[in-house]
Amino acid sequence: MKIAILSRNRRLYSTRRLVEACTQRGHEVRVIDILKCYIDIASASPAIWYMGEKLEGFDAVIPRIGASVTHYGLAVIRQFEMMGVYCLTESIALGRSRDKLRALQLLSRKGIGLPKTSFAYNVYDARELIKLVGGTPLVLKLCEGTQGKGIVLAETQKAAESVIEAFRELRAEFLVQEFIKEANGSDVRCFVVGDKVVASMERTAQDGEFRSNLHRGGTAKVTKLSPTERRTAIKAAQTMGLKVAGVDLLRSSRGPLVMEVNSSPGLEGIESATGKDIAGLIVAYMEENAKPVTTTRAGKG
């Protein structure tokens, strides 16, 4: 197959591993910076141009779209879809997962376990938001944050009210969520490919930190999932319509709770912790499922 990897940095671990996996399995692969693409929107022959070259003949696309360029990345993916190219991550699925509020609404509708969450545009009484999630301590999350950025732990009522007021003054959209004490600073990353969890790891925050993201100094080790955790991760990915996803769970007294469904999960942490060839599993999935698409088909999920 001729495969395009949409990535702004070919030196990133995940991009390098996907290139290696494609090459080792005999595919032609190119890394394309989406910000250097420009789109020819025409009903007869939609096209994408890249640094003066018309992109043609691709069988499949692997989007690795950073959060900061989601809007333009979605436009490029949609254009590939209009051209009939198979996209591992569909535009609809990517858009759902990047909108944290929409993602939680979809997961809630499917009956998937979630932390108690409240959201508002302009609440004059912060105490009402706090009451909805069961009081303090609680977690406040900017809707646009990634990799643990834009997340604050408020341990007291006064602290929570102050942060809510600050976010409101900035006109920032944010979520208020209950703090799951029994998770003890750990979460579980489930890596889903297709309809299977192919790897899982437990991430633990460093001392003095409540966010377990590896980008923030957290550590990771292999963990065994319960059948319920496995089913929850798969159902969460399918709800978003994602064929490849990193589903983050908290282990709580009422069962697994989904924190986030990541549409562009990093490979370095999960491959290092588990020793598995995740990049190879992703390419193998594409080999079995990549088929030309039509512009009339609806996104899954």
From Swiss-Prot:
Its cofactor is Mg(2+); Mn(2+). This is Probable alpha-L-glutamate ligase. It is an enzyme of class 6 (ligase). ATP binds at K141, E178, F179, D187, R211, S212, N213. Keywords: ATP-binding, Ligase, Magnesium, Manganese, Metal-binding, Nucleotide-binding, Protein biosynthesis. Mn(2+) 2 binds at E260, N262. GO terms for molecular function: ATP binding; metal ion binding; ribosomal S6-glutamic acid ligase activity. Pfam families: RimK, Rimk_N. HAMAP family: RimK. Mn(2+) 1 binds at D248, E260. GO terms for cellular component: cytoplasm. It comes from Cellvibrio japonicus (strain Ueda107). PROSITE patterns: ATP_GRASP. One of its GO terms (biological process) is SOS response. Residues 104-287 form the ATP-grasp domain. The gene is rimK.
